[in-house]
From Swiss-Prot:
Zn(2+) binds at C412, C415, C430, C435. Its EC number is 6.5.1.2. The active site is at K123. CDD domains: BRCT_DNA_ligase_like, LIGANc. Belongs to the NAD-dependent DNA ligase family. LigA subfamily. The lineage of its organism: Bacteria, Bacillati, Bacillota, Bacilli, Lactobacillales. DNA ligase that catalyzes the formation of phosphodiester linkages between 5'-phosphoryl and 3'-hydroxyl groups in double-stranded DNA using NAD as a coenzyme and as the energy source for the reaction. It is essential for DNA replication and repair of damaged DNA. Residues 596-674 form the BRCT domain. It catalyses: NAD(+) + (deoxyribonucleotide)n-3'-hydroxyl + 5'-phospho-(deoxyribonucleotide)m = (deoxyribonucleotide)n+m + AMP + beta-nicotinamide D-nucleotide. This is DNA ligase. GO terms for biological process: DNA repair; DNA replication. InterPro entries: BRCT_dom, BRCT_dom_sf, DisA/LigA_HHH, DNA_ligase, DNA_ligase_AS, DNA_ligase_CS, DNAligase_adenylation, DNAligase_N.
């Protein structure tokens, strides 16, 4: 909040504050729109945004075209082809109280000279999506981007079950809506992220954005995205005259529309709608962060038009964050499998958004410092994305005068080794590979179903094995005897035999399970399989260069660096030797793709860009891989052929600069026929 009303700032003070706010907001916009990794909640962003608006209104000469108040979305910065929106995808104005909403309605009625009917809709917490159909067939899906230029995500959109690939009528049209991740899918994804050593997503909106913008469509397909469609572009060509009719029309074509929209003719009906969904939002299977009012009459919408940034005929009412007050009694630091040390607040139990909350993640030391969170503080909690408990703010007025700052550990709470920051990481990390807490997590992960699949070796058994000094790393599992297991609590002959059998059977697993089970940073189950199939055995992977690993399709430099760093460690090399001596299989024994030696792309690295008349991108990728090609997502000096369709974008320019051979669709068809 501003230190004083905007009108009381001098011009010099206002200019300094405006520059400060713009810098902060632009950083947060970059994190939200481009990186899909916000570091502040929506309400914190909104508060700063409104401060900037107030100062610009008080001093119009300070308004510039590049101010966050004048722009939609963020600068496009990705490997996706660019899409020009013929009709801009604008943002929405918003209000934060029913009083402000009523004032907006009063201005609307005054402007048009008569009462106005609104179509009232839920504000889905996702990201805006445009879908274009030609003769009933989906030809393009794109993100909002900066409002004028978005990203072509057609290949990923094709994996979303609720998006019709063929309409029920052969119409050519554009619709827009929201791509979101259901709450259940979000919970499943974050559980998988943690299992695979990845970073959990902050909320479903960012999970949806990150999933839709994957270079590998198979990743998108696995993440269970969904859509609600709510805008019909150029509705007059279909004789649709109201927003409510447009939703029914789109539903009849096969689109998924939200069933909760309704027409309201007065603010009392709108107030009832708001109260209903303020109460019911937790029970919905998807996240909402407000409601939207749209002038129902489409001709009146056209008459009202738009500002440079927002339509004049719609407004979003954003729910205030549901909060609960509690007291922090402790901050507990725990060590994860990859060594990240994470703080958790232990609090008085409190009811929040339908559940009892007694713990909340504090994410990292920087958050504790930035929010000045202390043990004994009274704090307000909210649920990020209606799911993850977080501390909104500290009620400093209730803090006892002698409360010291929360201590930030300098050494690992498990092993006592000094904690470090790696690269540009915010997280504190223990890099001791023998850290007991990490070893326990690593052993549990190693035995998990998607890794070595050692049935019966869960966290409680692992903890007992450690406590009795029977295992110190995963190789020790293969030297356990019946006599060792007999020392465990409540472990009888049947349990002993079953666990020994499961351990013995795991020796024969194909090596991708071992690679995943080792818990290498950034290496999930899919990456492990790709690497195992590509290199054939663990020895070739261990001796491969970072560049050779990075060039494997769908792997890249981050995983390449992580693998080389991991296998350089003397402790890891010793561990692999021990696994080899324990007769653990180190070769890939899974299915392999047939290699076609006489095709024009056999053994070559191919990049596909642009749109094609005869192919969808997924179908073309599959066909080329069947001919022996390695299809990758980005152009480099290792690329052998760029296959370029229409609207090829930056990949074409990069290929030209690197003198990479370029093949158009006509040439491609000719080669496929040969």
């Amino acid at each position: 909040m501003l230190a004083k009303p905007a009108a009381q700032f001098t011009l010099e003070e206002a200019q300094a504050e405006v520059e400060k706010l713009r810098k902060q907001l632009n950083q947060w916009r970059l994190e939200y729109y481009t990186k899909d990794a916000p570091t502040v909640t929506d309400n914190v962003y909104d508060d700063h945004y409104r401060d900037l608006q107030a100062l610009e209104e008080a001093y119009p000469k300070l308004v510039t075209p590049d101010s966050p108040t004048q722009e939609v979305g963020d600068v496009i910065n990705s490997d996706f082809a660019k899409v020009q929106h013929p009709i801009p995808m604008l943002s929405m104005g918003d209000v934060f109280s029913f009083e402000e909403l009523s004032e907006w309605d009063a201005r609307m009625q005054s402007n048009v000279g008569h009462p106005v009917d609104y179509n009232v809709e839920l504000k889905i917490d996702g990201l805006a999506l445009s879908l274009i159909y030609e003769n009933g067939k989906l030809v393009q899906g794109s993100t909002r981007g900066d409002g004028n230029v978005g990203e072509d995500v057609t290949r990923n959109v094709l994996t979303i079950a609720s998006v019709p690939k063929q309409l029920k009528q052969p119409l050519s049209l554009e619709v827009r809506g929201e791509c979101y991740m259901p709450k259940a899918a979000f919970a499943k994804l974050n559980a998988r992220q943690e299992t695979e050593g990845g970073t959990p997503f902050a909320n479903p909106r960012n999970a949806a954005a990150g999933s839709l913008r994957q270079l590998d469509a198979k990743v998108t397909a696995a993440r269970e995205l969904d859509t609600f469609i709510y805008t019909l572009i150029e509705p007059e060509q279909f004789n649709v005259t109201t927003q409510h009719e447009a939703i029914a029309f789109m539903q009849a074509l096969g689109f998924t529309t939200n069933p909760s929209s309704e027409v309201a003719g007065d603010m009392q009906a709108i107030d009832t709608y708001i109260k209903k969904y303020t109460t019911d939002r937790d029970a919905l299977p998807y996240g909402i962060d407000g409601i939207v009012l749209k002038v129902n009459d489409l001709a009146l919408q056209a008459q009202l038009g738009n500002t440079v940034k927002v339509p004049r005929w719609e407004i979003a009412y954003k729910f205030p964050p549901e909060e609960a007050e509690t007291v922090i009694h402790d901050i507990v630091w725990t060590v994860g499998r990859t060594g990240v040390v994470t703080p958790t607040a232990v609090m008085d139990p409190v009811q929040l958004a339908g559940t009892t909350v007694a713990r909340a993640t504090l994410h990292n030391a920087d958050m504790i410092r930035d929010k000045d969170i202390r043990i004994g503080d009274t704090v307000m909690l909210h649920k990020a994305g209606d799911i993850i408990p977080e501390v909104s703010r500290v009620l400093v007025a209730k803090r006892p005068a002698d409360t010291p700052p929360a201590p930030i550990p300098e050494v690992c709470p498990s092993c006592g080794q000094k904690l470090v920051h790696l690269d540009d990481e915010v997280a504190l990390r223990c890099i001791n590979p023998m850290c007991p807490a990490q070893v326990q997590e690593q052993l549990t992960h190693f035995a998990s179903r998607n890794a070595m699949n050692i049935d019966g070796l869960g966290p409680k058994i692992v903890a007992q094995l450690q406590a009795k000094h029977l295992v110190k790393d995963v190789a020790d599992l293969y030297h356990l005897t019946a006599a060792d297991l007999a020392k465990l609590d409540k472990f009888k002959e049947k349990s002993i035999n079953n666990l020994l059998s499961a351990i013995n059977n795991s020796r024969q697993n194909s090596v991708e399970r071992l690679i995943f089970g080792l818990g290498i940073r950034h290496v999930g189950g899919k990456a492990a399989r790709i690497l195992a199939e590509h290199f054939g055995d663990l020895d070739h992977l261990m001796t491969a260069s970072q560049e050779a690993i990075a060039d494997v399709p769908n792997i890249g430099p981050t995983i390449g660096e992580a693998i080389v760093t991991y296998f350089k460690a003397a402790t890891v090399q010793k561990l692999i030797t021990q696994l080899r001596e324990a007769d653990v299989n180190l070769r890939y024994t899974g299915p392999t793709k047939p290699v076609v030696k006489d095709s024009f792309v056999a053994g070559k690295t191919v990049v596909i860009t642009g749109k094609f008349a005869e192919f969808s991108r997924p179908a073309l990728t599959k066909q080329l891989e069947g001919l022996g090609a390695k299809v990758t997502g980005s152009v480099s000096k290792k690329t052998d052929i760029l296959i370029a369709g229409d609207a090829a974008g930056s990949k074409l320019a990069k290929a030209q600069s690197l003198n990479v051979p370029i093949m158009n669709e006509t040439e491609l068809l000719a080669n496929l026929k040969d």
